[in-house]
Regions:
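Cofactor-binding loop segments of dinucleotide-utilizing enzymes, especially the Rossmann-like FAD-
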Residues: 78, 194, 240
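C-terminal regions of RecA-like/P-loop NTPase motor modules
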Residues: 1-11, 16, 129-132, 136-144, ...
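A short alpha/beta connector and helix-capping loop motif
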Residues: 162-178, 188-189, 243, 250, ...
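Flexible loop/turn segments at secondary-structure boundaries
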Residues: 52-54, 81-85, 127, 154-158, ...
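Conserved inter-motif catalytic segment of the P-loop NTP-binding fold
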Residues: 13, 69-165, 173
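Structural recognition of the conserved hydrophobic beta-strand(s) that form the central parallel beta-sheet
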Residues: 75, 148-149, 186-194
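The Walker A/P-loop phosphate-binding site
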Residues: 1-95, 301-303
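Hydrophobic/aromatic beta-strand patches that form the interior of the parallel beta-sheet core
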Residues: 44-46, 74-76, 118-120, 190, ...
Length: 303
């Protein structure tokens, strides 16, 4: 079908006159300059090495967005139990561990969690299609704004398609399906991906402050190849120097790709990522000494 000229012209004029809908902010200018949550049918990737805290940060961001903008999300985390995911949401929401919290507070936080999140209990193996079918069934009865799928490589392959397309084209097909699902339902789809083995061998040069330690992933380092970066709207890399004597508690977030800068956000400099300091017991993050969750506009423990 040929695109409608009037619709195209209207969208161009919207850009000209600043009427384009902006991605949602955290109200921290240094972060909002680079990262926005865009809900109007976007496919987003989070990439990074194993054991750097990708899942932890992503769940934290989803919890932050849920509270700040009253949003609802679905989480599919096949390498974590539903209990562990819910626990992280509760601890992030309370700003302290469950050991430090009363049963009354935990109960209130669980109610909040259940109202804003639906967690898919990964007790069976999913393909991309069976997962999307289940998510669509949830969408039909419980309206939500975004979904986290992680990790991508935990999804079983549809071998009929895999045999027809081959590995590289199969990934393109799956990513296209994710993208179309996001557009159809007007939601944000986030997919968490690992890096290739060779990326583990890449380290910072001798003159770098992290000399000899693993480098952050680039788009070409994603397991499955360039299809992922090519197909996604926005891409972030989550990295942490886990063996550094002092900076192990800092999570570095590189914004590698922003497809539509008109809606907010832009890539970070390769040597100036967004650095988030992990709070004690990993119950949240701080940026330049400011707690991202419990700032002046979000009171601690107010449910």
């Amino acid at each position: 079908m040929i695109a409608d000229k009037n619709i195209i012209q209207q969208k161009i004029l919207d850009i000209k006159h600043g009427r384009v809908k902006q991605g949602l902010k955290m109200d921290i200018p240094e972060i909002d300059e680079h990262l926005r949550l865009k809900l109007d049918g976007t496919l987003n990737l989070a990439i990074g090495h194993a054991n750097v805290g990708k899942t932890s940060l992503l769940i934290y961001l989803f919890t932050l967005w849920a509270k700040k903008h009253d949003l609802r999300f679905v989480i599919f985390s096949s390498e974590n139990t539903a209990q562990s995911v819910a626990r992280k949401i509760v601890e992030f929401r309370l700003g302290k561990t469950i050991q430090e919290s009363s049963e009354v507070l935990i109960s209130k936080a669980m109610d909040w969690c259940y109202n804003h999140f639906k967690i898919i209990d990964a007790e069976k193996i999913y393909t991309y299609k069976t997962l999307l079918d289940e998510v669509q069934a949830i969408k039909d009865v419980w309206d939500f704004h975004g979904i986290l799928i992680e990790p991508y490589n935990s999804l079983s392959k549809d071998y009929a398609l895999y045999k027809s397309y081959g590995g590289y084209e199969y990934n393109y097909y799956c990513l296209t399906e994710f993208r179309m699902f996001a557009k159809k339902n007007n939601i944000a789809v986030w997919v968490n991906c690992h890096g290739v083995t060779d990326a583990l061998r890449k380290s910072w040069g001798a003159n770098h402050e992290y000399a000899g330690l693993p480098r952050a992933l680039q788009l070409a380092d994603v397991e499955g190849g360039g299809a992922f970066g090519n197909r996604a709207d926005d891409v972030i890399c989550i990295h942490r120097q886990t063996t550094h004597s002092q900076d192990w508690m800092f999570t570095q977030m590189y914004v590698l790709k922003i497809k539509e800068i008109e809606t907010g956000g832009r890539p970070t400099s390769h040597d100036e990522p967004i650095k988030l300091r992990m709070k004690i017991n990993n119950v949240g993050y701080e940026f330049l000494g400011q707690d991202l969750f419990f700032n002046k506009s979000i009171k601690a423990l107010q449910l």
